[in-house]
Design a protein with these regions (language model features):
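Core segments of cupin and vicinal oxygen chelate
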Residues: 2, 13-62, 98-121, 149-156
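Residues that flank catalytic or metal-binding motifs in active/ligand-binding sites
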Residues: 6, 54-56, 85-87, 123, ...
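Vicinal oxygen chelate
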Residues: 7-15, 59-65, 74, 80-96
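A cross-kingdom feature marking solvent-exposed beta-strand/loop segments within repeated
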Residues: 38-46, 74-78, 86
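Active-site beta-strand termini and strand-to-loop segments that position acidic
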Residues: 60-63, 126-130
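Conserved active-site beta-strand-loop modules that form the wall/rim of enzyme catalytic pockets
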Residues: 65-68, 133-135
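Hydrophobic secondary-structure block in the mid-to-C-terminal portion of proteins
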Residues: 127-157
Length: 157
């Protein structure tokens, strides 16, 4: 499937990004990349289809396993108001579509993706087995952008 050692982040849903950065940053001795706020994050879910949602997120600069904090809109996969805390682990993969299909063949469920399965899933998917652990498969093609961001640069293309 993939190398589980390629986990590069733990995704945590939070109700308030700034507050969580303060609390966790000082307590865990973390520094943060520049927080990102987008008004139109692409997400497809089986229940809602394609949508574009507001999202705030940030990563710790320290690695190789980073902390990702996410503040999403109500009733979204990123909503930390009702159910904050550890949400998923993120893993770099060479081919999001292929890896996702392999997991689905093994009984995992597709929770969300950047675009629909018919469009090839896009750059990320959230998948889970019946046991409930959520894994985010992320295209390794964006790793250079993330490395630049963690080093103090921009995440933009």
């Amino acid at each position: 499937m993939f190398n589980f050692q390629d986990i590069y982040h733990i995704g945590i849903r939070v109700p308030n990004l700034s507050r969580a950065m303060e609390e966790m940053g000082s307590s865990l001795s973390l520094t943060w990349a520049e927080p990102i706020q987008t008004e139109a994050q692409s997400i497809w879910t089986p229940e809602e289809g394609q949508r574009y949602l507001p999202l705030k997120f940030v990563y710790s600069c320290e690695g190789p396993q980073h902390i990702e904090l996410l503040e999403g809109p109500p009733d979204s996969i990123w909503d930390g108001r009702q159910d904050s805390g550890v949400h998923h682990v993120g893993v770099w993969v060479d081919d999001v579509a292929n890896q996702t299909e392999q997991f689905l063949k093994n009984g995992w469920t597709l929770l969300a993706s950047s675009v629909s399965p018919e469009q090839g899933y896009g750059g990320y998917t959230y998948i889970a087995p019946n046991s409930g652990m959520i894994v985010e498969l992320v295209s390794q093609s964006i790793l250079p952008r993330f490395e630049r961001w963690w080093a103090g640069g921009s995440l933009a293309k």
